[in-house]
C-alpha cells in the first residue's frame, strides 16, 4: 500500500534507484514532433534540443542543446544557459526536466528509435481500444 504522507513520498523519491529515476526525467515533445512520431513524452537525453517553458524571464523560451542530465536531482544542463560565479567562472543553470519541451531529438542511438516505435505502437493500441469502448456506450 502506498502512503499518503508527504514525507514518506519524498523519501521514496530521494531513494529511488537510477533505473527508476530515469522515468522521472521525461518531457513533452513539441507539437511537430508529436505529430511526426505519434507520442507525447520521451525521456530527455544528452544531445536533445529543448526549450524552457517555465522559469525566470532570462530563462523563459531559451532553446539549446542538453549538455548533461543529472538523475540524482532530476535536472538538466542546457548549452548556453549559464551564470557567473563570484570569481567569474561560468557554471550551468540547472533546469528541472518537467519545465522544458523537447524540440529536436537526438536519434543517433538505434535503441532510442526502437523505444519511440514501441511507444508509438502502444499509444495507437490504447487509442484504438479507447475508441472501441466509447462506441460501445
Swiss-Prot record:
Pfam families membership: Ribosomal_L26
Superkingdom as given in the UniProt entry: Archaea
Gene Ontology biological process terms, A to Z: translation
Molecular function as annotated in GO: rRNA binding; structural constituent of ribosome
Keywords: Ribonucleoprotein, Ribosomal protein, RNA-binding, rRNA-binding
GO cellular component, one term: large ribosomal subunit
Family named by the database record: Belongs to the universal ribosomal protein uL24 family.
Record function comment: One of two assembly initiator proteins, it binds directly to the 5'-end of the 23S rRNA, where it nucleates assembly of the 50S subunit. Located at the polypeptide exit tunnel on the outside of the subunit.
Xref: HAMAP family: Ribosomal_uL24_A
Quaternary assembly: Part of the 50S ribosomal subunit.
Record protein name field: Large ribosomal subunit protein uL24
Organism: Sulfurisphaera tokodaii (strain DSM 16993 / JCM 10545 / NBRC 100140 / 7)
Amino acid at each position: 500500500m502506498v502512503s499518503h504522507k508527504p514525507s514518506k513520498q519524498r523519501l521514496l523519491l530521494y531513494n529511488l534507484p537510477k533505473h527508476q529515476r530515469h522515468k522521472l526525467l521525461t518531457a513533452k515533445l513539441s507539437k511537430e514532433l508529436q505529430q511526426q512520431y505519434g507520442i507525447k513524452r520521451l525521456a530527455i537525453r544528452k544531445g536533445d534540443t529543448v526549450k524552457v517553458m517555465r522559469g525566470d524571464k532570462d530563462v523563459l523560451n531559451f532553446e539549446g542543446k542538453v549538455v548533461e542530465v543529472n538523475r540524482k536531482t532530476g535536472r538538466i544542463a542546457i548549452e548556453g544557459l549559464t551564470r557567473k560565479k563570484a570569481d567569474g567562472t561560468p557554471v550551468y543553470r540547472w533546469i528541472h526536466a518537467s519545465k522544458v519541451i523537447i524540440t529536436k531529438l537526438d536519434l543517433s542511438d538505434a535503441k532510442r528509435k526502437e523505444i519511440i516505435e514501441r511507444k508509438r505502437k502502444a499509444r495507437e493500441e490504447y487509442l484504438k481500444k479507447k475508441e472501441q469502448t466509447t462506441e460501445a456506450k
